[in-house]
Curated annotation (Swiss-Prot):
ATP binds at residues 100, 290-294. The lineage of its organism: Archaea, Methanobacteriati, Methanobacteriota, Thermococci, Thermococcales. HAMAP family: RTC. PANTHER family: RNA 3' TERMINAL PHOSPHATE CYCLASE, RNA 3'-TERMINAL PHOSPHATE CYCLASE. Its main location: cytoplasm. It is found in: Cytoplasm. Gene3D superfamilies: RNA 3'-terminal phosphate cyclase domain, RNA 3'-terminal phosphate cyclase, insert domain. This is RNA 3'-terminal phosphate cyclase. Its EC number is 6.5.1.4. It holds the Pfam family RTC_insert.
Length: 350
């Protein structure tokens, strides 16, 4: 049985998501020890359990230690013959983080897999589902991966209640991804939403983001969709707001996002998202810092060479987890917090 040290690096949920997904892909049982050992509240938290239990359902696995506070987890996968996965997160736990665990394993299923997940679509410390849908999936398509995601209802902290459905197709031809530098930004797009709030919140967020982008990129077209609901016809548990914006370049899309909070003016939310995106575009590297770590499990099997706007701890952790399974796969350049490069030197064939 392969043993993974859950305290490596940041020692957070990233190790769990990637290690258990790779266990499902390879069919190899794993034991994760020292889970979140360096944290003030060590062991599994509820948000980590959702991803693990979803992967358990997908692979009909036997699991030991999948409970809150547990610092060790054993996972024995069987096969990915399940056709539908349903995950119910009772809080505003992140739907995106559950999908980050599920997607790498789902693409290796023999047939299409559908999913439905209830929880948080737009919550702190995780990419919004809009980011996953418009930026992550766009990049995965270049690798030959087809995934459909539909946001039926948004969910915000603390009430959650977001509802996302989708379909993952078996990964056929694995195409390497070469995404080094971009030359041209064709346009900016985005989605600014406000639920159980006045429509002007979404409108002001979008306007502030547009103005901030125009100051730096005056000649590039910008189109930000404003999403809001009539009082009495709003299906959300809410209230909540947020904005995701992205640059369409000649290579991939780079993104930035921000969340509304009680007492935080909509203009600040819009400007925060624009600032995050502008920072990602500065080095002219084709992969933004939020996407880099998400691509690692897929690049392992497809090959490629990506240049990231910023090396993050999450990126380094994901490379480390992959190499616990397969030995040396990647070559990396760059320090944490600086632009960097990640190249596959030994693609894994299953």
């Amino acid at each position: 049985m392969r043993v993974i040290d859950g305290s490596y690096g940041e020692g957070g949920g990233q190790i769990l998501r990637t290690a258990v997904a790779l266990s499902v892909i390879t069919g190899e049982p794993i034991k994760i020890i020292n889970i979140r050992a360096k944290r003030s509240n060590p062991g599994l938290r509820p948000q980590h359990l959702h991803g693990i239990l979803a992967l358990k359902e997908l692979s009909d696995a036997k699991v030991k230690g999948a409970k809150e506070g547990s610092t060790e987890l054993e996972f024995y996968p069987k096969s990915t013959r399940v056709r539908h996965v349903k995950v119910l997160i009772k809080t505003a736990g992140s739907i995106s983080l559950v999908l980050q665990a599920l997607l790498p394993a789902m693409v290796f299923a023999e047939e299409e897999v559908t999913f439905e997940i209830t929880g948080g679509t737009d919550v702190a410390w995780s990419p919004p589902v809009d980011y996953l849908k418009h930026i992550t999936l766009y990049a995965l398509e270049k690798l030959g991966i087809k995934v459909e995601i539909e946001i039926r209802r948004r969910g915000h902290y603390p009430r959650g209640g977001g509802f996302v459905i989708g379909k993952v197709y078996p990964w056929g031809t694995k195409r390497p991804l070469v995404a080094r530098t971009f030359d041209k930004i064709y346009s900016f797009e985005g989605i600014s939403h406000a639920v159980r709030l006045p429509s002007h919140v979404a409108i002001r967020q979008a306007k502030a983001a547009k103005e901030a982008l125009e100051r730096v990129y005056p000649s590039i077209p910008i189109k930000i969709h404003e999403e809001y609901y009539e009082q009495g016809k709003d299906p959300h548990f809410g209230p909540g707001s947020g904005i995701v914006i992205w640059a369409n370049t000649d290579v991939l899309r780079l993104g930035g996002d921000a969340l509304g909070e009680r007492g935080k003016p909509a203009e600040i939310v819009g400007r925060e998202a624009a600032k995050a995106l502008i920072e990602q575009l500065g080095p002219r590297h084709a992969v933004d810092k939020f996407l880099g770590d998400q691509l690692i499990p897929f690049l392992t099997f497809a090959g490629g060479d990506i240049w990231v706007s910023e090396v993050t701890k999450h990126l380094i952790t994901n490379v480390w987890v992959v190499e616990q399974f397969f030995g040396r796969v990647f070559e990396m350049e760059g320090e944490i917090g600086k632009p960097g490069k990640v190249r596959v030197v030994k693609k894994v064939e299953l």
